[in-house]
UniProtKB/Swiss-Prot annotation:
Organism whose genome encodes this protein: Aliivibrio fischeri (strain ATCC 700601 / ES114) (Vibrio fischeri)
InterPro entries cross-referenced by the UniProt entry: DNA_Rcmb_RecR, Rcmb_RecR, Rcmb_RecR_Znf, TOPRIM_dom, TOPRIM_RecR
Pfam families: RecR_C (PF21175), RecR_HhH (PF21176), RecR_ZnF (PF02132), Toprim_4 (PF13662)
One GO term of the biological process aspect: DNA recombination
Single GO MF descriptor: zinc ion binding
HAMAP family given in the database record: RecR (MF_00017)
Limits of the Toprim domain: 81-176
SMART domains in alphabetical order: TOPRIM
Official protein name in the record: Recombination protein RecR
Role, per record: May play a role in DNA repair. It seems to be involved in an RecBC-independent recombinational process of DNA repair. It may act with RecF and RecO.
Gene this protein is translated from: recR
Length: 200
C-alpha cells in the first residue's frame, strides 16, 4: 500500500528517536493520526518550543532555558567546591536521584574517541581547563561511564586536574546490590576487588 508523502515524512521523522525502527515509527504515526490528534499537536508544539528555546548552560553545559542553570546558580552548591563530571545531561538526573551529591556539574556531551575523531576540544575539555583555572573547584568527581572510552576520558581529565592541583576521584563501580558473583563479568569483578573498602 502506498502511503501519503506527509505520512512517510512523519514516520521517517519519528525514526530519529533511539530504538525506533520502521515498524515502531509506523505504529506511533498511525496511533497519533487515528486516536490522538490532540496529543500529536501538543507533542509538535512542545518539540518545536524545546528545540528553539532549550540551550546549554554557559557554566556546566547541561540543558537549560536560561544562560546559566539553576544548579550552577545555587549558592550552596557553589560553596561546596565539588564538581561532578558526567557524559550527558541524563547522568545529572541519575546522580541527583541518589541525593548524595550537593556540588556542581560539568557535562562532556560525550567521551574521548580518537577512532571516531572525537578529541578533547570536542567534549569541552578546553572549557573544563578554564573552569579549573578559576580556582573555585576544590574536588572533582569523575562519573564517566565504565566503558573503555569512559575510562580513557576519566584518565585524561585526572591528568588535567593534577596540572591544576585539584584532587580528582573516580566513582566506584563493581558488583551491583543483589547481584550474584558467578553472574558478574570478570572486568566488573576485577574493579570490585581493586576498589574494595576496609570494614575495620
Amino acid at each position: 500500500m502506498r502511503t501519503s508523502g506527509l505520512l512517510e515524512q512523519l514516520m521517517e521523522s519519528l525514526r530519529c528517536l533511539p530504538g525506533v525502527g520502521p515498524k515502531s515509527a509506523q505504529r506511533m504515526a498511525f496511533h497519533l493520526l487515528q486516536r490522538n490528534r490532540q496529543g500529536g499537536m501538543q507533542l509538535a508544539d512542545a518539540l518545536s518550543q524545546a528545540m528553539s528555546e532549550i540551550g546549554h548552560c554557559s557554566e556546566c553545559r547541561t540543558f537549560t532555558e536560561e544562560d546559566t542553570c539553576a544548579i550552577c546558580l545555587n549558592p550552596k552548591r557553589q560553596a561546596s567546591g565539588e564538581m561532578c563530571i558526567v557524559e550527558s545531561p541524563a547522568d545529572i538526573v541519575a546522580v541527583e536521584a541518589t541525593g548524595q551529591f550537593s556540588g556542581r556539574y560539568f557535562v562532556l556531551m560525550g567521551h574521548l574517541s580518537p577512532l571516531d575523531g572525537i578529541g578533547p576540544s570536542d567534549i569541552g575539555l578546553d572549557l573544563l581547563d578554564h573552569r579549573l583555572n578559576r580556582g573555585d573547584i576544590k574536588e572533582v568527581i569523575l562519573a564517566t561511564n565504565p566503558t573503555v572510552e569512559g575510562e580513557a576520558t576519566a584518565h585524561y581529565i585526572a591528568e588535567l586536574c593534577q596540572e591544576h592541583q585539584v584532587p580528582a576521584s573516580r566513582i566506584a563501580h563493581g558488583v551491583p546490590m543483589g547481584g550474584e558473583l558467578e553472574l558478574v563479568d570478570g572486568t566488573t569483578l576485577s574493579h570490585s576487588i581493586l576498589g574494595r573498602q576496609k570494614l575495620y
